[in-house]
Amino acid sequence: MDAREHPALLAEDDEQHLLGLLTYAIDGDRCEVLTLHAAEQWRGAGTALIEEVERVAVAAGCRELWLITTNDNVDALRFYQRKGFRLAALHPGAVDRSRGSLKPEIPEIGDYGIPLRDELELHKEVAP
């Protein structure tokens, strides 16, 4: 998956400095958040981007936002749950498999010294 091949939303400040970027893909009535990057935490860019992609998804007839993150990404897990996402699935060993077959450069140890092994899927229902 190359996020550059998908629609993107930008968050900018009043002086048009880039604060964040979100890429997404709509498939039927589901919208997947592919990437979300905020230049700085706690400035509202991530929240603004999630709110905007939800509006885009609803306008496109989607009923659900969803995404996948890794087991070490505790900051993302906190953020998404605070935004109404719920844990929907655990994919044990998914990162291990990707490291072995697709991307050997994936590190063994992730954020906060946590072994990087699994993927977690989060979902949020949206109102059409």
Go through each PLM region and give its residues.
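Acetyl-CoA-dependent GNAT
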Residues: M1-Q41, T47-E51, R117, E125-V126
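Conserved functional loop/turn residues at catalytic and ligand-binding sites
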Residues: H37, V53-E54, G61, G84
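Conserved acetyl-CoA-binding loop-helix of GNAT-fold acetyltransferases
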Residues: R43-A57, V74, R78-R82
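Conserved GNAT acetyl-CoA-binding A-motif
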Residues: A57-T69
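Conserved beta-strand-loop-alpha-helix junction that forms the acyl-donor binding cleft
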Residues: L67-A76, A88, P92-R99
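Short, P/G- and charge-enriched loop/turn segments at secondary-structure junctions
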Residues: E105-G113
